């Protein structure tokens, strides 16, 4: 996920409502389409139903957030955004923000905590195993790493997630943020970056068929592969300034990059962060747990 040798240098915000991160994971980083009905109708008329297998795209390219848009990161629960915010990222179980560009968070390479037993009971072969035991993300032990090692398994995983994508589209979201692209770095060598790119391309295909843009989450080391091979439309980075990665992203994505810095681990003041010419204009500051405004720990600022 990042241009670092440490495989645990990664996002830490998957479903903040589900649980609090443990101490060891404190600094690990995880995370209303107007006209979508027309796009879906066009797909149906043309016979290109929005399935992973279809290979069909909705008329017109789904658009990323406009460059420079302030996008609030609300994975800890949706709330009325502060003044000046033009978009939000919310969990797939939440609703989009009316009148704002809304991104739907989906965990695409690991299981969600609430779904752990479903995957083990109903599709255990799609969960990566080591010595007969399911392989977990050690920093998020209630998440299992999905087995994207073969084309057949990738296809089935993508089909399982298709309903979530469809729900995001029907709810009125504009885009998908797909998390844990770097899960292969926690696979004990059983998965590769090529596997991740191949699965991501299936997700991008389905998102586009649903009329949704799709964002690469973190993984600066993917370079142009995320854009050119996987088919991502923009990127969401956590702490690109803190870890001196912003230029790695902007070299590929230009202004189509959203960055979230965290108040507990800034490199300098937030004013200094915003003054750095390498930092994208769509940069915000949030508290690590992505709390809502009624929580005393809540933090939100934008450049």
Predicted regions and their residues:
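Intrinsic disorder/low-complexity segments enriched in polar/small residues
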Residues: 21, 27-29, 178, 233
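Secretory targeting and sorting signals
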Residues: 13, 20, 30-59
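Intrinsic-disorder-associated, low-complexity terminal segments enriched in Asp/Asn/His/Tyr and depleted
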Residues: 4-9, 18, 22, 28
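Glycan-processing catalytic domains of CAZymes
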Residues: 57-303
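Residue-level detector of alpha-helix boundary/anchor positions
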Residues: 11-13, 17-18, 224
């Amino acid at each position: 996920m990042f241009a670092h040798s440490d495989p645990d240098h990664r996002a830490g915000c998957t479903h903040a409502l589900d649980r609090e991160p443990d101490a060891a994971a404190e600094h690990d980083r995880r995370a209303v389409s107007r006209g979508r009905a027309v796009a879906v109708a066009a797909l149906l008329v043309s016979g290109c139903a929005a399935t992973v297998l279809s290979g069909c795209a909705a008329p017109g390219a789904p658009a990323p957030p406009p460059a420079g848009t302030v996008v609030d990161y609300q994975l800890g629960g949706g709330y009325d955004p502060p003044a000046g915010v033009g978009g939000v990222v919310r969990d797939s179980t939440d609703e989009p923000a009316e009148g704002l560009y809304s991104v739907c968070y989906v965990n695409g390479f690991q299981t969600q905590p609430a779904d752990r037993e479903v995957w083990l009971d109903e599709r255990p072969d799609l969960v990566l195993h080591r010595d007969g035991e399911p392989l977990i993300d050690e920093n998020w032990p209630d998440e299992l790493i999905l087995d994207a090692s073969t084309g057949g398994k990738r296809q089935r995983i993508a089909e399982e997630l298709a309903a979530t994508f469809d729900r995001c589209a029907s709810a009125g979201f504009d885009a998908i943020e797909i998390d844990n692209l770097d899960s292969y770095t926690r696979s004990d060598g059983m998965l590769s970056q090529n596997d991740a790119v191949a699965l991501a391309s299936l997700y991008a295909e389905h998102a586009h068929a649903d009329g949704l843009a799709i964002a690469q989450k973190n993984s600066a080391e993917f370079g142009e592969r995320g854009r050119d091979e996987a088919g991502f439309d923009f990127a969401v980075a956590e702490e690109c300034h803190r870890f001196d990665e912003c230029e790695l992203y902007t070299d590929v994505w230009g202004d189509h990059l959203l960055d979230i810095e965290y108040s507990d681990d800034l490199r300098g003041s937030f004013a200094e962060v915003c003054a750095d010419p390498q930092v994208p204009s769509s940069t915000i500051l949030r508290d690590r747990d992505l709390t809502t405004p009624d929580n005393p720990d809540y933090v939100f600022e934008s450049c």
